[in-house]
């Protein structure tokens, strides 16, 4: 894994993005923003799921005028998503923590300057949200919907904002496929110092989005690219946050939560491993300590994996071993193994939290 690229640090509300700040997770509500009750309920769900920043669509004046009250109620920093109607950004900038503009449809230089001035007055950032499906006509005609076209759009709009004296910027270059997304971010990275918002747009339902996002976002994170991210899923809000956190964890960019290892099963297994793994997965969701937990169906790989695990199960015939920090802790009947594993994992979390508090 490459060292993370150092970028300029900005703030969306109280959440730092870039520099040495942790990589934050974002999501977006799907209710009509003007329906304050429904939108607040979705924001609360995202906050409970572990989201750091939430974006809301601003499609009309009714949405824009709801932002002041939403900002007052929201437990998370609020980003206004603006397309086409720049005047909505001017209203939104009075309340929210960040404005996202799509350079492909926001309009003329004068309109972008008006948005920049409104954001500068309040000290909030602008995300230049380039989308491969809606490039400005001049870049679409010259480059097509290619990574180069996306990069040129980003550079052009960054230069515009800088010429207006505005440098409180973050950038995204999203396409609906893995290759264009990765190539665009990779090409732009050495050319600018601004933080990157990672994402694959229109990524599809849970299964398809997990594959696309893991490949694109996980690959970029391993290259050291990325400061904040959203996993786009046609599905439940919480899924976006859960998948994003998993990508951060398994790419090594987030040292929090359980890293679960389990074998794929084979003819040697004499226990209901699939059921056991599902029960373990569900019961350790709440653990925030960076623990490695291994659930293995037989002794072939169990002892080797357990050497690297904080706590492990090695199933046998009707019973199994609990292995803690590479040492056999006890042998128990099969039906008691999951309970004991969870109990020991929670002990390890308490020890981790106590040590963290002391330090």
Swiss-Prot record:
Q: Name one Pfam family in it.
A: GcpE
The record's free-text note on cofactor binding: Binds 1 [4Fe-4S] cluster.
Q: Sorted alphabetically, which keywords does the UniProt record give?
A: 4Fe-4S, Iron, Iron-sulfur, Isoprene biosynthesis, Metal-binding, Oxidoreductase
Q: Which residues bind [4Fe-4S] cluster?
A: 263, 266, 298, 305
In Swiss-Prot or TrEMBL terms, this protein is called: 4-hydroxy-3-methylbut-2-en-1-yl diphosphate synthase (flavodoxin)
Molecular function terms in GO for this entry? 4 iron, 4 sulfur cluster binding; 4-hydroxy-3-methylbut-2-en-1-yl diphosphate synthase activity (ferredoxin); 4-hydroxy-3-methylbut-2-enyl-diphosphate synthase activity (flavodoxin); iron ion binding
Signal sequence extent: none
User: Which reactions fall under this protein's catalytic activity?
Assistant: (2E)-4-hydroxy-3-methylbut-2-enyl diphosphate + oxidized [flavodoxin] + H2O + 2 H(+) = 2-C-methyl-D-erythritol 2,4-cyclic diphosphate + reduced [flavodoxin]
What are the required cofactors?
[4Fe-4S] cluster
Q: What is the lineage of its organism?
A: Bacteria, Pseudomonadati, Campylobacterota, Epsilonproteobacteria, Campylobacterales
This chain's source organism reads Wolinella succinogenes (strain ATCC 29543 / DSM 1740 / CCUG 13145 / JCM 31913 / LMG 7466 / NCTC 11488 / FDC 602W)
Give the gene name. ispG
**Do the record's keywords include Aminoacyl-tRNA synthetase?**
no
Q: In what pathway does it function? A: Isoprenoid biosynthesis; isopentenyl diphosphate biosynthesis via DXP pathway; isopentenyl diphosphate from 1-deoxy-D-xylulose 5-phosphate: step 5/6
